[in-house]
Structures are given as structure tokens and as C-alpha cells.
From Swiss-Prot:
Chief subcellular location: secreted
Highest taxon of the lineage: Eukaryota
Domain annotation Ig-like C1-type: ranges: 22-113
InterPro entries, A to Z: B2Microglobulin (IPR015707), Ig-like_dom (IPR007110), Ig-like_dom_sf (IPR036179), Ig-like_fold (IPR013783), Ig_C1-set (IPR003597), MHC/Immunoglobulin (IPR050160)
PANTHER family from the UniProt entry: BETA-2-MICROGLOBULIN (PTHR19944:SF62), MHC CLASS II-RELATED (PTHR19944)
Cellular component annotations (GO), alphabetically ordered: extracellular region; MHC class I protein complex
Keyword annotations: Immunity, Immunoglobulin domain, MHC I, Secreted, Signal
GO biological process: antigen processing and presentation of peptide antigen via MHC class I; immune response
Role: Component of the class I major histocompatibility complex (MHC). Involved in the presentation of peptide antigens to the immune system.
Localization per record: Secreted
Name listed for the protein in its UniProt record: Beta-2-microglobulin
Family in the record: Belongs to the beta-2-microglobulin family.
Subunit description: Heterodimer of an alpha chain and a beta chain. Beta-2-microglobulin is the beta-chain of major histocompatibility complex class I molecules.
Length: 115
């Protein structure tokens, strides 16, 4: 009986791990970038499973404090999405990035494209 429970647990764990979907990340602003002015930067992370996700916004390599983050919600396909946002002053040459780590994996940086 114990062996059956162990095997069933291992099967469940294997199936859960096989459903891992890495996140898709988009970084954008609420308004077109106007250098020297404040804009809302939004990091939209979606299509990920399981819901273990860490994210932060950085400006020039320094974490931006007091960002707002939504709770993870699930889409029709049972994969998750969430956003993190803040208002930030953007000057020419600034590098604004969203740093995301999913399911304990190393962090990846996603840069805001500023034209």
C-alpha cells in the first residue's frame, strides 16, 4: 500500500512538472515616452504555469521602490498572468527593465524599448 502511494505521488509530481510553461513578458508605457517627464511603466507577464513568479522593475540597474503588483490570475487556458507597474521619470539614455524569475529559475531581464 505504501509503495502504491509513493508511486502515485511521484506520478502526480511528474505530471505537474510536465505542465511548466515559461512566461511571456511585455514591458511598455501607458503613454508615448517623452524624455524628461514621468510615465507609467508596466510589466505584463502572462502565459506562465505554475504561478511561482518573482518580478521587479529596475531603472539603470537599481530596483524601483513602491511598485504596484496585481495578484496572479488565470486565463481561459489555466495559465497565469500578472502585472507590475510604477510611475518613473525617464530621461534619454535611461535603461528601464522588468526582471522576472519563474519557478525558481534564474532571473531574466526584459528591457523597455525607448525610441
Amino acid at each position: 500500500m505504501k509503495i502504491a502511494l509513493v508511486l502515485l505521488s511521484l506520478l502526480a509530481l511528474t505530471l505537474a512538472e510536465s505542465n511548466i510553461s515559461p512566461p511571456v513578458v511585455k514591458v511598455y508605457t501607458a503613454e508615448p515616452v517623452d524624455f524628461g517627464k514621468t510615465n507609467e511603466v508596466i510589466c505584463y507577464v502572462y502565459n506562465y504555469h505554475p504561478p511561482r513568479l518573482e518580478m521587479r522593475l529596475e531603472k539603470n540597474g537599481v530596483e524601483i521602490p513602491d511598485c504596484k503588483q496585481t495578484d496572479p490570475s488565470f486565463q481561459h487556458n489555466w495559465k497565469y498572468y500578472t502585472t507590475k507597474s510604477t510611475h518613473v521619470h525617464i530621461d534619454k539614455g535611461d535603461k528601464v527593465e522588468c526582471v522576472v524569475s519563474h519557478n525558481g529559475n534564474p532571473s531574466k531581464k526584459y528591457r523597455l524599448d525607448i525610441f
